[in-house]
Design a protein with these regions (language model features):
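Active-site neighborhoods and metal-handling regions in enzymes and metal-associated proteins
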Residues: 1-196
Length: 196
């Protein structure tokens, strides 16, 4: 989209989403404020591009300085969950199978108290919630029986919100191919470390 000449033109918050510190663990939309970023805090960036009437949604994270032990636990859980989604999103599987696999992975590792949700649709609306990537059936929101086929695109998303520690958010477009998938965003899942 960027190469085609996209613009920043849509958002839930009236601007791009930027949050730091305690504002990263709310798990909701995060409009920019006058809060000053502090050393040792997570910084969350959620950018919304548009080309024509097709929308994009990419989130990434940074940390100001090296993470402490608690932040490292959140980072590790977040990165491993992101990698798990990419690993299991394959043609021929259902969204419910993928959601169940990732949910069981999260629960098995003890992360279910702070990792929720795994993806949403994207297209003409910023959050086309149908079909949400989950193993739970919610009317007008999910279809766990939807079979993933080549050329299907899902906005994979992970939020890891630990109150008192910080929050991370990943949103990336994942294109299903004949043999697997391709992440259309090349940013790493690991947060950028920004030193003073």
């Amino acid at each position: 989209m960027r190469d085609a000449g996209s613009e920043f033109a849509w958002t839930f918050t009236g601007g791009q989403e930027v949050a730091s510190g305690y504002r990263t663990w709310t798990g909701a939309c995060t409009p920019a404020t006058d809060k000053i970023v502090q050393y040792g805090e997570f910084v969350l960036l959620d950018l919304h591009g548009m080309y024509g009437l097709m929308l994009g949604d990419v989130s990434h994270n940074a940390i100001m300085g090296q993470p402490d032990a608690d932040q490292r636990k959140v980072i590790d859980a977040y990165v491993k969950t992101c990698e798990r989604i990419v690993e299991v999103m394959r043609p021929g599987k259902t969204l419910g199978e993928v959601g169940k696999n990732v949910r069981e992975f999260v629960v098995r590792n003890g992360w279910d108290k702070f990792i929720r949700g795994f993806g949403h649709g994207i297209g003409h609306a910023g959050h086309e919630w149908y079909p949400t990537l989950t193993d739970v059936k919610i009317p007008h929101c999910t279809n766990p029986d939807y079979v993933i086929e080549p050329n299907y695109m899902q906005m994979i998303a992970v939020t890891a919100n630990q109150v008192g520690v910080g929050g991370l958010r990943m949103e990336r477009p994942l294109l299903i191919t004949e043999t697997g998938n391709e992440l259309l965003s090349k940013m790493p899942f690991e947060p950028w470390v920004i030193e003073r």
